[in-house]
Amino acid sequence: APSMTTPEPASKRRVVLGEISNNSSAVSGNEDLLCREFEVPKCVAQKKRKRGVKEDVGVDFGEKFDDPQMCSAYVSDVYEYLKQMEMETKRRPMMNYIEQVQKDVTSNMRGVLVDWLVEVSLEYKLLPETLYLAISYVDRYLSVNVLNRQKLQLLGVSSFLIASKYEEIKPKNVADFVDITDNTYSQQEVVKMEADLLKTLKFEMGSPTVKTFLGFIRAVQENPDVPKLKFEFLANYLAELSLLDYGCLEFVPSLIAASVTFLARFTIRPNVNPWSIALQKCSGYKSKDLKECVLLLHDLQMGRRGGSLSAVRDKYKKHKFKCVSTLSPAPEIPESIFNDV
């Protein structure tokens, strides 16, 4: 796909979440974000959760998995175990918690929070795994606890605090996360929310994320005509876009990772079928299983969803990420590419 190379965006002052307001196009609707005058969204019928294909197509990684921490003989077993783990109710957020549980928090507010957390992860140079895990904590907590919008940022930084302890070699301390909120909250408030989070999640802090499954699927992603680094950055970009959209909670992480791979390959080589037998075997998903998620991700990529949430897009405009957010994807995805390979 052609690349529109643009100069790196000028550095901007990090925005404290409380300063963001009236961002009506963040995800959908015309809500005034983080303002007091707001109508509670009407409940909608719960959609059926996408559980992935039930057909056992087998997982075949062969000898291509080059992670020195993983013995290739056990990669398939580990992948299957993680897929079972992602289906456990205790590790999954409700896909419609905004409508069913929350009274004051909206999907737009969630999008603004996630966008801000991406900025925080960049400023503190946190691992991508920390970002994914923190956002999963936010969604799981909000699935069972009603939260006032004034506490949403507190939940975000407390989730980051726990996730950084879980993933980082040198995790940030409480004072760092208080500082990142411009002292909106005290250290005592952050620690109290941390304790509440741990109690709510019953100390089940380890969960497979989209980032987890991307590592497995990339192991069998073969395309000699595409620079490996460019593909990886594009896949990471699309995966982080999925974090912004509340609608992606409908899909399990392994399906999102497979859809990200599908869309990244289509973006780079739109005239070639993006799926293959090898990818189908390793992911456990056929092309048709990915269709709904791929189309949602494509809308995010095109800016038709979450267009005003800029942190992820700005991050991947940088030359060190090969400017992958400036790639021009096809405006529409043909139905034919979802046919079986």
Curated annotation (Swiss-Prot):
Q: Which Pfam families match?
A: Cyclin_C, Cyclin_N
Q: Which domain of life is it from?
A: Eukaryota
Q: Enumerate the UniProt keywords alphabetically.
A: Cell cycle, Cell division, Cyclin, Mitosis
A single Gene Ontology biological process assigned to it is:
cell division
Main function: Essential for the control of the cell cycle at the G2/M (mitosis) transition. Interacts with the CDC2 and CDK2 protein kinases to form MPF. G2/M cyclins accumulate steadily during G2 and are abruptly destroyed at mitosis.
Q: Which family does it belong to?
A: Belongs to the cyclin family. Cyclin AB subfamily.
Q: What is this protein called?
A: G2/mitotic-specific cyclin C13-1
Protein species of origin = Daucus carota (Wild carrot)
